[in-house]
Amino acid sequence: MDFQVFIITGLSGAGKSQSLRILEDLGFFCVDNIPPKLVPTLIDLCLATNGKISGLAVVIDIRTENFLESFKEMVEIIKSRNIPYKILFLEAKDEVIVKRYNETRRIHPLLKEGGTILESIRLEKEKLWEIRNLATDIVNTSDFSIKELKEVILKIVTSLNTTVKPNFLITITSFGFKYGVPIDAHLVFDVRFLPNPFYDPKLRPFSGKSEEVRGFVLSKKEARDFIEHIKKLLDFLIPLYEEEGRTVLNIAIGCTGGRHRAVVIADEIFFYLAPKYNTHLLHRDIEKDVHILK
């Protein structure tokens, strides 16, 4: 996506920090609670990365000194440089904000000694009224789930640039069941039904990265069929995960020791997905049985 700036402001307790986390998942470089005067400098630093940082998202709240004046000045600088930008103003019903503060036990930034949260909310609304009028988008989060907030923010971001997509990260891990299933796995595939190279004395010393073991495993029709079924399943599932708002998918492929069969199958799935997605590969247990094999 072309470089763009996303400014989050609004009422305390309305979801600014959560919105920033969502934008981080969308590939923005994110900074929380930054003074408006520093934003133009931060933009320069981002642009100097030659495209490595394609979007900047910042949270600016009322605690900044000379908030209104410096905020307006920041917006004018961004406009003068013809940088696409959005100002998202978040708000919520008074009772919802009070409930959120009671649940988190955090202190409202404008809460004065002896005052109440409601009084602080009303004071903040007064101070932010002019900023609200500058907003390109105003969102009331009173009845939003996190998923619904994600959907709204994605729509706002794509209105700036239609090519934006979440940074969807896929990690493929081969493992041995004898060492335990990866605790962060979303999908687990058991390949212990495949013939085991461990029982061939000539293949036993090699890992699934070797041509010898790869050739043995992939020569089996059931292995090739299994790989094709997994590819079709992932082609079906991954777009649904993306649509749902997920940004991480951990796929675990296991055999007995995690040295032979799982490594081969994990490699094949990685080779298939890597050209289309941000994909990482980890062979967790490939070296754990080496001392046994010698």
From Swiss-Prot:
Binding site for ATP: G10, L11, S12, G13, A14, G15, K16, S17
InterPro entries: P-loop_NTPase (IPR027417), RapZ-like (IPR005337), RapZ-like_N (IPR053930), RapZ_C (IPR053931)
PANTHER family registered for this protein in UniProt: RNASE ADAPTER PROTEIN RAPZ
Physiological role: Displays ATPase and GTPase activities.
Entry protein name: Nucleotide-binding protein Dtur_1129
Taxonomy of the source species: Bacteria, Pseudomonadati, Dictyoglomota, Dictyoglomia, Dictyoglomales
One family name in Pfam for this protein: RapZ-like_N
Family, per entry: Belongs to the RapZ-like family.
GO terms for MF: ATP binding; GTP binding; molecular adaptor activity
Binding locations of GTP: D61, I62, R63, T64
Keywords attached to this entry: ATP-binding, GTP-binding, Nucleotide-binding
